[in-house]
């Protein structure tokens, strides 16, 4: 009992199991608990914009080398493009080999499209040009109010660059942002105490609303997706970590709390503040973490990429829509663009899938109705894969920059160096410790 009281990941795991039981045994009660999960995610999202701002500004201002900022950003984008392309291709290959939709013989005309209208309408408003233009905020207050990560990141980079250019004149502002960072991570510690409550409510709602029977009806698709996501993590991300001189399984154990929080909430964004904190304590470069992790939540969604190609071909197979190899390559090309607009929030992948089907044209958009019931059950694997992928990205780019403290990282993963994982008991958050050179 003492270990349960001190261990966040055990509390969240227990909450997920209890939530699933409540949703299964008392569906109406489970469905009514949705506000618990939504409230927790809103509390976390409330902190994301200011944390990204404080981390990026202090990292860039203390680094002082603006060319390095651009270099880190370009390396991050190149890494994202390679890994997400591989993820898209893997989903395509698995869909071709496993054929999870074969034999369903669904007539698109018989599908009820009313339930997916909100997704298809939303997809039409999220084209590639709109997405790129949306990186530039109308005003700073609006970007922070809406929690738009890319807009906040752009402003933070400019603010940090200006602060670095001011040198000693900007020191009072830098000290203020350092102090702000300390306060924000203390608040994160308070909020994460509510993670079990949020996970319980979110899981109870998912099972109560959609039911276990929905899972069984499309079991082959769900099994394919979970197996493919696991394969990607073990093979691709494991290979990247091996290049960095680290063990994948020790890395997964290190971020187990974040994984269970994401499992319960179905949103990788819910663990963003803790993930940034963990990566800095692992020994990753502070400027790299500040740039790569927030960017990754729009450009490095590995789990979502696997889902998009797998689900697209599933719909084609289920509706007996013939797709040639050339058309599959066209789908891959379209997804290379549309997948970058998938927000790391619950339902973002489904909206992007609707946009992709609309752009491709030959696969019926009505087929989305087949996925509506099970999409929520697949969102856990999407979100967890996205989370792990962004953590590995910060390690890889730090290694690429020659700024990964490998000795510390190995020691932290081996458990021989305390990682101070309890947020509420951490006297000095990573934004301060990293900037002052206190990584050990």
From Swiss-Prot:
Coarse class of the protein's main subcellular location: membrane
InterPro entries documented for this protein: C4_dicarb_transport, Na-dicarboxylate_symporter, Na-dicarboxylate_symporter_CS, Na:dicarbo_symporter_sf
Region entry Disordered, spans: 419-440
SUPFAM superfamilies: Proton glutamate symport protein
Coiled coil spans: none
Bilayer topology: Multi-pass membrane protein
Keyword terms of this UniProt record: Cell inner membrane, Cell membrane, Membrane, Symport, Transmembrane, Transmembrane helix, Transport
Recorded GO MF terms: fumarate transmembrane transporter activity; malate:proton symporter activity; succinate transmembrane transporter activity
UniProt key word Nucleus: no
UniProt GO BP: L-aspartate transmembrane transport
Transmembrane segments: 8-28, 40-60, 74-94, 147-167, 187-207, 221-241, 288-308, 354-374
Function: Responsible for the transport of dicarboxylates such as succinate, fumarate, and malate from the periplasm across the membrane.
Cross-referenced PANTHER family: AEROBIC C4-DICARBOXYLATE TRANSPORT PROTEIN, PROTON/GLUTAMATE-ASPARTATE SYMPORTER
UniProt name for this protein: C4-dicarboxylate transport protein
């Amino acid at each position: 009992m003492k270990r349960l009281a001190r261990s966040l990941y055990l509390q969240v795991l227990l909450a997920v199991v209890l939530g699933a039981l409540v949703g299964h045994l008392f569906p109406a009660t489970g469905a009514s608990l949705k506000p618990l999960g939504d409230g927790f995610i809103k509390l976390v999202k409330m902190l994301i914009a200011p944390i990204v701002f404080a981390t990026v500004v202090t990292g860039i201002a203390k680094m002082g080398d603006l060319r390095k900022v651009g270099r880190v950003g370009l390396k991050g984008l190149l890494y994202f493009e390679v890994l997400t392309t591989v993820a898209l291709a893997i989903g395509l290959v698995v869909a071709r080999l496993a054929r999870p939709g074969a034999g369903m013989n669904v007539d698109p005309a018989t599908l009820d499209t009313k339930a997916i209208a909100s997704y298809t309408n939303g997809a039409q408003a999220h084209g590639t040009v709109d997405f790129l233009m949306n990186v530039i905020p109308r005003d700073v207050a609006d970007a922070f109010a809406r929690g738009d990560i890319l807009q906040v990141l752009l402003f933070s980079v400019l603010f940090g660059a200006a602060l670095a250019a001011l040198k000693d004149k900007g020191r009072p502002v830098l000290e203020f942002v350092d102090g702000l960072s300390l306060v924000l991570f203390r608040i994160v510690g308070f909020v994460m105490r509510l993670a079990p409550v949020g996970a319980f409510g979110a899981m109870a709602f998912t099972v109560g609303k959609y039911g276990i029977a929905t899972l069984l009806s499309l079991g082959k698709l769900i099994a394919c997706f979970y197996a493919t996501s696991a394969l990607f993590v073990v093979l691709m991300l494991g290979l990247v970590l091996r290049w960095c001189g680290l063990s994948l399984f020790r890395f997964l154990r290190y971020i187990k709390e974040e994984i269970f929080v994401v499992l319960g909430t179905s949103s990788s964004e819910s663990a963003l503040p803790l993930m940034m904190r963990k990566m800095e304590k692992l020994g990753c470069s502070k400027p790299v973490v500040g740039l790569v992790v927030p960017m990754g939540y729009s450009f490095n969604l590995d789990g979502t990429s696997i889902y998009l190609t797998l689900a697209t071909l599933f719909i084609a197979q289920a509706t007996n829509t013939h797709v040639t190899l050339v058309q599959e390559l066209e789908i891959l090309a379209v997804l290379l663009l549309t997948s970058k607009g998938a927000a790391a929030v619950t339902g973002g992948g489904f909206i992007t899938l609707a946009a992709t089907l609309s752009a491709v044209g030959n696969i019926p958009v009505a087929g989305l109705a087949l996925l509506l019931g099970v999409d929520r059950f697949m969102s856990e694997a999407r979100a967890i894969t996205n989370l792990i992928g962004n953590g590995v990205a910060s390690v890889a780019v730090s290694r690429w920059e020659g700024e990964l403290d490998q000795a510390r990282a190995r020691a932290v993963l081996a458990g021989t160096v305390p990682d101070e994982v309890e947020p509420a008991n951490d006297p000095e958050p990573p934004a301060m410790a990293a900037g002052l050179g206190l990584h050990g």
